[in-house]
Amino acid sequence: NNIKVSVLGSDGYTCQIPRIKEGMKLLGHTLSEDSPDLIYSNDPKGYEKALILKEKYPNAYLIFNFLDIPWHIENIERQTELLVKNFFLKADAVSVISSKVQKDMAKFYDKKIHVIYNPIKDVYFDEKIKKNNMFLYVGRANDPVKRIKLVHDSIIKIPEGLKNIKICGSENPGFGNYVGVISDKDLNKLYNSSKFVLLPSKAEGIGLPMIEGMICGTIPVTCSDNLTAREFSPSEFICEPNAQSIVNKIEELDKEYETKREMALKLGEKYKIQFDKKTIAKNIIDIFNSEKN
């Protein structure tokens, strides 16, 4: 059954909305804000507009999705309580992007919380691309939770380390080869040509570079205090959140690189389907169908 869907939230090249919209279209649904059957907001940026649409079209089914609780922010408990009161309690359903966020949100919201994940970029394993780059970092480098300093302090201990890292995203941390925001095609080449993707974040909603890396046969190195890493990544790729531990982990993985890379690729095959934009769109529609009927 094809339905009319409004997809709201942060809508920019580096955001998830463009891919969720593509997923909806691939499933044959129509994107529309004119008497939609389903209103979906991927993050708080779209919540207000979603409520206005819901008031206008009370029969529409409203889903609020939530990305993650940034525990490091002052008054975050209070802010989250207000979010629940002002928004979640007015929704027909609430979803999140990982089991970790589901557990976090359950402290504030006692109704059912669906896990839908969020879509990866259009990346894939390309065996023709040679591994000619050692390290890759993908993400908003200056967000304190991302702990970019750990990347710097680790690779500075590795000969030529600083020369062998490429950093892509909207923020320049001031070291390594910063390439800025790049197309999916170029990002795909970067993942495939790099040996390791470093993601030492303290917390992530998902940590898509870890997933995208494995899909492309790049080993993600993550930290043990990031609970989402433990949800999706093998324990062999996880180390303590300090520079020496990261260096030791890189050296250990590099010694058995081919075997460990196979492990990443194997998981990547599963994640390529699980995190595909069409799958995510279907997960959203499934909530609508199961609750509506």
Predicted regions and their residues:
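A charged, aromatic-enriched C-terminal amphipathic alpha-helix characteristic of glycosyltransferases
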Residues: G12, K255-N289
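Active-site proximal beta-strand in glycosyltransferases
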Residues: L38-Y40, L53-E74, S95
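Membrane-proximal helix-turn-helix segments that form the acceptor-binding/catalytic region
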Residues: I76-V94
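Carbohydrate-associated surface elements
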Residues: K100, P119
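Conserved donor-binding/catalytic core segment of Leloir-type glycosyltransferases
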Residues: K128-K146, H152-I155
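Aromatic "clamp/platform" in nucleotide-sugar-dependent glycosyltransferases that forms part
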Residues: K202
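Conserved acidic donor-binding segment of nucleotide-sugar-dependent glycosyltransferases
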Residues: C223, S233-Q244, I250-Y257
